[in-house]
Amino acid sequence: MPYPFKLPELGYPYEALEPHIDARTMEIHHQKHHGAYVTNLNAALEKYPYLQGAEVETLLRHLTALPADIQAAVRNNGGGHLNHSLFWRLLTPGGAKEPVGELKKAIDEQFGGFAALKEKLTQAAMGRFGSGWAWLVKDPFGKLHVISTANQDNPVMGGFAPIVGIDVWEHAYYLKYQNRRADYLQAIWNVLNWDVAEEIYKGA
C-alpha cells in the first residue's frame, strides 16, 4: 500500500519464535526499529504529494528521480520498511523448514540442493561487514542468486526480486546472541517458513 505507509501486523505473537529469536528482540525490532522506518518514510514524503501514490518498490527503483533532499531518507527508511515487511512474513510460525515446490526445484538445479544454498547464504551473511542483509533473489531472467546488501538497501534497487532475506543488523540478534552472528544465523534456519518463500517466488 502507498502513503501513508503503515507498520504491518505480524500476525503472530512476539514469543512465537522462541527459543531461536527471543520475544524482547522481536518486540523492539518490530515496534521500534520498523516503526521508525515507517514514520520517517512518511515524513520524507509528506511535502511531495505527487509521490504519495507510489509503492515503496517504485520509489526505491527510481531513487535518482526523487527530489535530492529525500533520496537518502527514502533509501534508508523505504528500504527498511520493505525489507522488514518481507522478513516478518518469512518468519511466520509453522510451514516447511526447507524449500518446497517450484522454488525447491530451482534451488536444486541452480545450487545443487538446500545444503549448498544454506552455506552460500550463511557466507553472504557472515561476510557482510557491519549492518546489512543476505538475500536469495531472482533476476529478470528467472535465475536465482545469493547476494548481500549494505544497510537497508533492497535488491529491487539492483533489478532483482527478493525471495528470502536475512537481517544481519545487530538489532536483529544482539539481545540474545550479542556479537555471535554465526549462532544467530544457525538458529534462523529453524524459523524460516519456506511455504511463504514459495509463494513469494511464484509471485516474483
From Swiss-Prot:
Entry-linked PROSITE patterns: SOD_MN
Cofactor annotation remark: Binds 1 Mn(2+) ion per subunit.
Coiled coil segments of this chain: none
Enzyme class: oxidoreductase
Annotated InterPro entries: Mn/Fe_SOD, Mn/Fe_SOD_BS, Mn/Fe_SOD_C, Mn/Fe_SOD_N, Mn/Fe_SOD_N_sf, SOD_C_sf
EC number: 1.15.1.1
Statement: the UniProt record of this protein carries the keyword DNA-binding: no
Cross-referenced SUPFAM superfamilies: Fe,Mn superoxide dismutase (SOD), C-terminal domain, Fe,Mn superoxide dismutase (SOD), N-terminal domain
GO terms for MF: metal ion binding; superoxide dismutase activity
GO cellular component: cytoplasm
Keywords for this protein: Manganese, Metal-binding, Oxidoreductase
Matching Pfam families: Sod_Fe_C (PF02777), Sod_Fe_N (PF00081)
Binding site for Mn(2+): 29, 84, 167, 171
Necessary cofactors: Mn(2+)
Catalytic activity: 2 superoxide + 2 H(+) = H2O2 + O2
Biological function: Destroys superoxide anion radicals which are normally produced within the cells and which are toxic to biological systems.
Entry similarity comment: Belongs to the iron/manganese superoxide dismutase family.
Quaternary structure annotation from Swiss-Prot or TrEMBL: Homotetramer.
Protein name: Superoxide dismutase [Mn]
Organism expressing this protein natively: Thermus aquaticus
Source lineage: Bacteria, Thermotogati, Deinococcota, Deinococci, Thermales
Underlying gene: sodA
